[in-house]
Structures are given as structure tokens and as C-alpha cells.
Design a protein with these regions (language model features):
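Active-site-proximal specificity loops/subdomain of glycosyltransferases
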Residues: 56-121
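N-proximal low-complexity "stem/linker" segments adjacent to membrane-targeting elements
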Residues: 1-20
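Short, acidic, metal-binding catalytic loop of nucleotide-sugar glycosyltransferases
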Residues: 23-34
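Short beta-strand-to-loop acidic/aromatic patch adjacent to the donor-nucleotide binding site
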Residues: 120-135
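Short internal beta-strands
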Residues: 36-43
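C-terminal catalytic/acceptor-binding lobe
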Residues: 200, 220-299
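Conserved catalytic core of nucleotide-sugar-dependent glycosyltransferases
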Residues: 86-106, 132-228, 234, 238, ...
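Short, charged/polar "capping" segments at the starts of alpha-helices
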Residues: 15-16, 43-52, 163
């Protein structure tokens, strides 16, 4: 057993599918309840939390090790509170659909989470999104798999962002990253010469937080953060993560959770859908169940 924690960041309006994600997490991955789960949130009441825990107990037959922790997001110093700033002139319309809370999430997972007080005692963390579903047993402990292979990061490749979204973020993100590379070349072991919009699927990832707590990564994140463009241009944590790993991590430090050979669904995308078990599919809420069957048919 590794020193690890599983993390969600959710909100009250997403609870109708988040609870199903939790059920499938304990059913198929955290089966013996050995790893704690922290659910960060900013608006879930104590009554609703109690109801969720009762529902989980009824489903699992035991009370899982789940802690709900309220988090207060604040804008970094110097960031405008004018809503108009978050729909920049010329910004692609799809980017304007992401509310301020989404951009707080990008900042949190991009760099703040690693030194959050509730995370400091852990080495590894697994992030699971509210609309992430494990649809078959994960037979091997993912954290042990990380340690055995010397991985410092792993994701589950699944689906892609819109090319227009990537292109919009890429315009300024790569320029900012190049500025950091130019002034920190002696600290960067593997500086990228170009970036074509590659990213990681951070909706389901495992991080060795010892790596991400290192000063060089934290300085890189601070450089990105101070531009304000996590908020103004929706620079995502998946993009921040890819460039930081590319700069500072050894080439063989990244694993792919597809190696663990299980079915994972995020939103409307499913990986290894033929491995899903019927008793897990039955737990899926609509419309996610319909999305799964479309993936199974290859639609």
C-alpha cells in the first residue's frame, strides 16, 4: 500500500452523477477502502453530505473513507473581477461557455493542489472527475503500479479537446512557456523546442506530488499563474501539466493507465468499452449509459 489519496473537486449541481462515480470508484478501484477519498467543494451542505454517505453505505454495505472539505476559491492578486474580461475580444465562443468556477478548477489542479494543507502528508494523488466512471475491476493497485515502474505521472488517454480550443490557448500559452524556458534554461533538463497543442487527460490522473512540489515546477506554475490567463484565456491544467512535465520530468517518468486494462468512461468517451461489466453499467446514470453504448458500438 502506498501513501496516497483519491481526490474529487465537485459542486452541488453535479451531485446527480458524482454519487454514481463514487459508487463505481469503490466498487471497481478502491475496493477494500484502503485509500482515503477527499471531496473538495465550495457549496455542498452538511445535510446533503450526510445523505450521500448514507446512500454510499447502502450501496457498498459499509461506510467508505470519504471526507468532504469545503474550499474557498479566491482570485489571485491583480486579476480583474470584471466579467467582461473573461470573454476576451476574438475568443472562440466555446471558451466563453466555461464559467469562472471552471477556471478556478484549472488553477487548483494546475499547481495549487500539491501544497494544499490536506494534501501535504501524501506522496501520490489520483484525480477523478465527477463524470468519471470505472466500469470494470482495476485488478492492480494503480499507486503500486506507479511505484513499481518509477512513474511520476500517469493519465488515461481518452478523447480530445476541440482543435479550436487548443489553438486559442496555444497562442499565448506557448509564448509564456518560452519566456520561462529562456530565463531558466539551466534548470530545464529537456526543454521543448515547439509545442503543437499536446496535453494530458487530467480528468483521470495520478501525480507523484514530490515531483510537482519541486521548486522548479512551482516556479513554472507561478510564471504561468501571474499572467492571469488561466482566467482570461482558460489556460487549462491539462496544458499546464504537459509543458511542465515535458520540461522537468525524465522521459520514462510518464505512464498510461490503459496498461492496467480496465474500462474507464469520462463524459461521452469510454476506453476499453468491451471490458465493462453489466453490473457496473447498471450503475451508470443517463445520459452517460447511452454514451457508453454508443462507444461500445464505435459510434
Amino acid at each position: 500500500m502506498q501513501n496516497a489519496v483519491i481526490v474529487y473537486l465537485t459542486r452541488q449541481r453535479d451531485l446527480w452523477y458524482f454519487v454514481h462515480s463514487l459508487k463505481l470508484l469503490f466498487k471497481n478501484l478502491n475496493t477494500d477502502n484502503k485509500y482515503p477519498v477527499i471531496v473538495f467543494h465550495d457549496d455542498i451542505t452538511s445535510v446533503i453530505i450526510s445523505n450521500i454517505l448514507v446512500e454510499l453505505h447502502n450501496f457498498l454495505g459499509y461506510l467508505p473513507n470519504v471526507k468532504f472539505e469545503k474550499i474557498a476559491f479566491t482570485l489571485p492578486e491583480g486579476i480583474s473581477t470584471d466579467p467582461a474580461k473573461y470573454a476576451m475580444e476574438g475568443e472562440h465562443p466555446t471558451l466563453q461557455q466555461f464559467p469562472l468556477g471552471y477556471r478556478h478548477m484549472c488553477r487548483f489542479f494546475g499547481g495549487l493542489i500539491f501544497n494544499h494543507p490536506s494534501m501535504l502528508k501524501y506522496k501520490y494523488y489520483m484525480r477523478v472527475d465527477s463524470d468519471s466512471f470505472m466500469l470494470s475491476k482495476v485488478s492492480h493497485d494503480p499507486f503500486q503500479w506507479m511505484a513499481d515502474n518509477g512513474y511520476e505521472y500517469a493519465d488515461y488517454p481518452l478523447g480530445t479537446d476541440s482543435p479550436k480550443e487548443v489553438e486559442w490557448a496555444r497562442r499565448g500559452m506557448w509564448e509564456s512557456a518560452k519566456e520561462f524556458i529562456a530565463t531558466n534554461s539551466e534548470r530545464i533538463s529537456n526543454p521543448p523546442s515547439n509545442w503543437e497543442g499536446e496535453l494530458y487527460n487530467t480528468n483521470f490522473e495520478i501525480c507523484d506530488m514530490d515531483f510537482f512540489r519541486k521548486q522548479e515546477y512551482q516556479d513554472y506554475f507561478k510564471h504561468i499563474d501571474t499572467t492571469g490567463n488561466i482566467f482570461y484565456r482558460r489556460w487549462g491544467d491539462h496544458v499546464i501539466r504537459w509543458l511542465g512535465i515535458r520540461m522537468f520530468m525524465k522521459p520514462n517518468g510518464v505512464g498510461k493507465m490503459t496498461e492496467l486494462n480496465f474500462c474507464y468512461q469520462h463524459g461521452s468517451f469510454a476506453g476499453n468499452p468491451k471490458l465493462a461489466t453489466q453490473d457496473s453499467i447498471d450503475v451508470l446514470p443517463e445520459p452517460f449509459k447511452g454514451c457508453y453504448y454508443k462507444c461500445l458500438k464505435g459510434e
